[in-house]
Design a protein with these regions (language model features):
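Small, basic N-terminal interaction modules of short regulatory proteins
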Residues: 1-65
Length: 65
């Protein structure tokens, strides 16, 4: 999993797993999902990310070794 934040556009991109994207679905005006050929979510994009969450703090829980 990769998290990327783009300060210039206030966009948070969360890649759940590397995959070829075959479809993009808009959940709302600020959130999009990227789907692979099987329809599984492989990435999520959040526009206006800093207004939706406190990006100064990231907590990871239950991370498997």
């Amino acid at each position: 999993m990769k998290l990327k934040y783009f300060d210039d556009t206030d966009t948070l991109y969360i890649e759940l797993r590397p995959a070829a994207v075959s479809e993009t679905r808009e959940l709302d005006e600020s959130t999009t999902l990227e789907l692979d050929q099987e329809g599984s979510v492989c990435a999520i994009t959040f526009e206006h990310a800093s207004t939706r969450s406190d990006l100064r703090k990231l907590t990871v829980e239950g991370l498997a070794a």
